[in-house]
Design a protein with these regions (language model features):
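Conserved N-terminal subdomain of the carbohydrate kinase-like
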Residues: 1-42, 209-218
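Conserved phosphate-binding/catalytic region of the ribokinase-like
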Residues: 61, 85, 113-218
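Alpha-helix C-terminal capping/helix-to-coil transition sites in glycosyltransferase folds
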Residues: 38-39, 93-94, 123
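Short, charged, surface-exposed secondary-structure boundary motifs
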Residues: 27-28, 81-82, 108, 154-158
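Short, acidic/turn-prone active-site loops that include or flank metal/cofactor-
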Residues: 21-24, 75-77, 150-153
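Conserved beta-alpha-beta core of the PfkB/ribokinase-like small-molecule kinase fold
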Residues: 42-118, 134-135
Length: 218
């Protein structure tokens, strides 16, 4: 069975996940080989995979040998609390870009958002902390950028983090400055939180692509 997750949405539009890892927990490092990492620039890891640390470490080793950068999303504060030691090892050894929301950053560092940003930045090249309706914070070395959220009526936050990361990494892999990467992340996230479900409808993508072009060209 493949990975499945049930999203339970509360009246405040927040979500709680009931997750079954399925085949992701059955795979081993032997299922990966260097050919699978050829011709890619970046490996994106979902934090739930830390339940299979052997697989994560093998993927990171192969990605590094292939010259790839590695991005990680912490996924869930309770997953971070349960696997704190493993996360610390993987992040400090392999991760270049780390995505977290405020709860996840607090679970990882034991600090509030500002101090968490500083602590995480000692381990990775780029730190991104998503701050809900306040937007997000992006830090690289001494550069700290505040990214505004795109104002929309929030219905369901499921998928917001994944879409933010997708937009951010699209900008990053196309050599955009971090401010524009964050703006693309906010744009995509805003297009999934104003409706139920974790996918942006196909009908919205033409307008989204136009807005991404506007961000790049401004």
């Amino acid at each position: 069975m493949l990975f499945r997750s049930i999203a339970l949405i509360t009246p405040d539009s927040e979500r709680t996940f009931a997750t079954h890892l399925g085949a992701a927990i059955e795979l081993t490092g032997d299922d990966l080989n260097s050919d699978q990492f050829d011709d890619y620039d970046l490996l994106y890891l979902e934090g739930y995979l830390i339940n299979n640390k052997e697989l994560v470490e093998k993927a990171c080793d192969l990605a590094r040998k292939a010259g790839m950068e590695i991005a990680l999303d912490l996924a869930s504060y309770n997953v971070v609390e349960t696997h704190l030691e493993d996360f610390s090892y993987i992040i400090s050894k392999y991760v270049d870009i780390l995505f977290a929301n405020e709860e996840e950053a607090r679970a990882y560092t034991g600090q509030d958002t500002e101090k968490a940003m500083e602590k995480i930045s000692e381990q990775v090249q780029i730190t991104v902390i998503k701050t809900g309706s306040q937007g997000s914070l992006v830090k690289r070395k001494e550069e700290l950028i505040k990214i505004d959220a795109v104002p929309v009526k929030c219905v369901d936050t499921t998928g917001a983090g994944d879409l933010y990361a997708a937009g951010f990494l699209y900008g990053y892999l196309n050599d955009q400055p971090l401010s524009k990467c964050g703006a693309m992340g906010s744009l995509l996230a805003s297009n999934v939180i104003d409706l139920m479900g974790a996918r942006i409808p196909d009908s919205r993508w033409p307008e989204i692509k136009n807005k991404v072009s506007d961000i790049i060209n401004r």
